[in-house]
UniProtKB/Swiss-Prot annotation:
Keywords: Endocytosis, Endoplasmic reticulum, Lipid metabolism, Membrane, Phosphoprotein, Sphingolipid metabolism, Transmembrane, Transmembrane helix. It comes from the Eukaryota. It is a multi-pass membrane protein. Residues 17-38 have a biased composition (Polar residues). The keyword Cytoplasm does not apply. This is Protein ORM2. InterPro entries: ORMDL (IPR007203). Its main location: endoplasmic reticulum. Belongs to the ORM family. Residues 1-78, 125-148, 199-216 are cytoplasmic. The lineage of its organism: Eukaryota, Fungi, Dikarya, Ascomycota, Saccharomycotina. Disruption phenotype: Double knockout of ORM1 and ORM2 exhibits defect in ceramide synthesis, increasing the level of total sphingolipids and causing phytosphingosine and dihydrosphingosine to accumulate; the accumulation of phytosphingosine reduces the phosphorylation of both YPK1 and LAC1. The mutant also exhibits random distribution of actin patches between mother and daughter cells, and shows a defect in endocytosis.
Amino acid sequence: MIDRTKNESPAFEESPLTPNVSNLKPFPSQSNKISTPVTDHRRRRSSSVISHVEQETFEDENDQQMLPNMNATWVDQRGAWLIHIVVIVLLRLFYSLFGSTPKWTWTLTNMTYIIGFYIMFHLVKGTPFDFNGGAYDNLTMWEQINDETLYTPTRKFLLIVPIVLFLISNQYYRNDMTLFLSNLAVTVLIGVVPKLGITHRLRISIPGITGRAQIS
């Protein structure tokens, strides 16, 4: 007899969007819920200037594991790395059209890239996709990358880019102390410090300046 089981294809193939139930955590028993009630970290309010985002509850962690977070997975692609170089080159060409001197052209390029990156990766919270039940509503895109694993190759690349950009632009305004200090402050305080582990899940609230920037 001919064994046809090897030639037959499975009737159902797992879709990329099929929930990953293997990583889900077990639901706590009723006794655990009574002894240790679950608190929703997203509802907490703090009047202090500096606060720290609490770890997700088990419901949020399960929601995060259900489907891939498409808001952050694209950042790991090598093509996404190239986008940063292309954006910097385009900014440099754009500002050179106005006849600015090289030091001002590189200053505007440096500040535009770093501030734009900060708004996109460190200021806006949540995700435009509603696949995870709002489990990422309290996290920035930077905190969503690589499941919050620090110093991955992608994170290191994104950390090095503003530093290299500053070193390149520094060749043009090294004799101008004002521009040097301005670019140094922007690079360090906005381009580097928010990417370090000491600022992970850290929130600095300045009344009237920083607000609840979140994708809805």
